């Protein structure tokens, strides 16, 4: 029986590098001179705090951060960006959560998608990952294509492929 795992993982050091690059870009931008603007990574809580003086500048900071994340190989769908910003005094703040691990409702949706496709594989939810087992390698590859083509709103990786 061949098998592989579907996971959703972020390499935290790549996220740290993206935040540092975004701060470097921020320090060179002319429109942010003299503005109290920061991008901070909290690795313990897995979130990025973006703070600046206006809502418009906040959106620009988020675009800078997304661009730096894409350059580092982090998909923008792994960032859970809230639609509303918090306003404290003269500063606007957004706390961007990092999506890591497959939540139970997403896992159930994936298993339902795979079973509904009539591909001869079994899907098992194992904590933050999903184990897919099947008799032929072709079935597993068609399952990978099915999951890649599905719009799930979260980046997924395939690892631990065993023949």
UniProtKB/Swiss-Prot annotation:
Disulfide bonds: none annotated. Keywords: Nucleotide-binding. It comes from the Bacteria. Pfam families: DUF520. GO terms for molecular function: nucleotide binding. GO terms for cellular component: cytosol. Nucleotide-binding protein. Belongs to the YajQ family. This is Nucleotide-binding protein HAPS_2236. It comes from Glaesserella parasuis serovar 5 (strain SH0165).
């Amino acid at each position: 029986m061949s098998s592989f795992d579907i996971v959703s993982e972020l390499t935290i050091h790549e996220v740290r590098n993206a935040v540092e690059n975004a701060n470097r870009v921020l320090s060179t931008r002319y429109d942010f001179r003299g503005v109290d603007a920061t991008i901070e990574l909290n690795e313990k809580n897995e979130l990025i705090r973006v703070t600046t003086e206006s809502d418009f500048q906040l959106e620009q900071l988020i675009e800078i951060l997304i661009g730096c994340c894409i350059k580092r190989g982090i998909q923008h769908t792994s960032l859970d960006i809230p639609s509303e910003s918090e306003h404290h005094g003269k500063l606007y703040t957004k706390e961007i959560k990092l999506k890591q691990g497959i939540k139970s409702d997403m896992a159930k949706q994936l298993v339902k998608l795979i079973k509904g496709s009539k591909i001869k594989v079994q899907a098992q939810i194992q904590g933050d990952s999903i184990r897919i087992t099947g008799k032929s390698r072709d079935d597993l590859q068609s399952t990978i294509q099915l999951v890649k083509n599905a719009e799930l709103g979260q980046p997924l990786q395939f690892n631990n492929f065993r023949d």
